[in-house]
């Protein structure tokens, strides 16, 4: 978590930096004492929360989230998405999500761009993309999302 603070020279001494790390861990719903652990000692959900704390450490305006929930089980995924929403309200940070998991769109996205082979093929409000997709690729992506009512 301290790496970004150190590389950007945020001007914190060791004690201030450790306090900031503790605060960030608590903000992402982890215990302060986890700051002394090695990465292999964390679960997938804990690792994702540490990654969020690392991003917040440098007080960004924008956080790029590349497949933030792809390796998480459904219950942990929901917790992480809820945490991201809380942090967005609290810190005023914006997110750019890169994901194949279209099921996260309703909970987080305001504006959506759909890319196919590196080019944006459709963009619009999250509601428009989800309810009235125009491009065949967007339609295919949405059709691939598992839904209970299709059974």
Residue ranges and their predicted role:
Residues 38-42, 46:
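Conserved ABC ATPase signature
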Residues 52, 80:
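Hydrophobic anchor residue at the start of the ABC signature
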Residues 105-107:
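A short, surface-exposed alpha-helical micro-motif characterized by mixed small hydrophobic
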